[in-house]
Amino acid sequence: MTKPNKELSEWIVPIDESDISSITLGELIDSAADEFPDIEALVYSNQPDVKEIRWTYKFLSDASTDLARGLLGEGLSPGDTVGVWGPNHPEWILTEYALAKAGLKMVTLNPLYKDQELIFALNTVKAKGLIHADNIGGIPASDLINTIKGEIPSLHHIHSFDKGLNQLLVNGAQSSIQLPAVNSKDIFMIQYTSGTTGMPKAAQMTHEALITSAKNSHIRWKVTNNQKVCHGFPLFHIGGSACMTLGAASMRSVSLPLYIFKPGVTLDIIENESCSMFIGAPVHLTAMMQDPSFQKRDLSALKSLVVGGSNPPVELMKQFSEAFDADVTNGYGMTETCGLSCTALPTDPPELKAIAGLPLPGVSLRVVDHNYQIVMNDMPGELLYKGPGLMNGYGNLPDGSSGINDDGWFPTGDLATMNSEGYINIVGRSKEMIIRGGENLSLIHISEPTRLLSISYAVFCLK
């Protein structure tokens, strides 16, 4: 790949139809089952906090069809929104595919939500249904739900992952309800952003955008059919429910999600299941390295690591590579881009694999200053995104806007640089930009010397 503009921080590429997955989630899981019915799609093993399962693609395809019919049979209609609330339970993924087949919308809910957060999240999208884990944080979820459901007028259908879904599966298997036609451009998933600049924003994402971003990231990482990939991303997050879940189905690989991250348990999974890839946050790798059993482990099957969620220093990436004896790559993405938008090439040197990397196929990027002008190479500015993974917009902004600029570019809010080859490095948030004498200054660039000198505390004064 060659950067179209060698001087300006701009990567503009045409969208090739071959880079877009114009299918629905239901079509994705069904096609995987048709091609490889007996390959394991989802495995939970060596995790004492959750039941052990080994679901094939055929099982997941058939069960999601039954559950979709069960949901429609109890009164939900295509277009209704259903919340999913809980940790990384296997039934979460089954529910995700079932909701997609039923033409329902899915709003993912953080298991750390308390009463007011849950009320806000469900009322904002006028949720008709809620599917939840039996216990969340060691507390029966039904206790909280019973206290708040009266404050959510639209909510009429509530089921737990265990007993509730089992009955819906039985009902659906006996039903002759015809599943609706679903379009790949229909909005399917709604996720709330962190809300660091105000109230949480409801990002709306289509089937097509979700699958396209997930598949293209896995192609870049060279994930293969039947490859075992363990990951530590929460399913309520875009990294878990989209990138890892839909990427695995796209490549027909085996997904091994962590129910709750525990370093020793994660090492058990990687070792006993012979996982060849682990994807998670830098803190996951650090915790595993510090586990007392780490040096005794046989991790010879593990060949590659992908980290996301932060921008680790090159030195730390090298430590990961040496400790696990595996290739390590960083990646950059966000909810609004349906997951990954940049990651390095497998052939890149370590210093390039430590930064955000190159745009995925079909993704265009710009780095602009406070006047919306494209900056020169290696100058910091706000990163703008345009591409097939872009959300349809926020669904709850007070002014009714989508959050996407009129020219189709989405302002990520992230501060970045782009080099002459198109590689992106995230250096902060745009609100941290300091403008001095017309020059954009990043706080990371200003504070970097203190890190190199191991200075713990410093005060910076700019004149």
Locate each region found by the language model.
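N-lobe entry segment of adenylate-forming
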Residues: 1-55, 59-74, 78, 147-154
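Conserved pre-ATP/AMP-binding loop-to-beta segment of ANL
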Residues: 22, 37-40, 160, 173-192, ...
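Structural core segment of the AMP-binding/adenylate-forming
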Residues: 74, 102-170
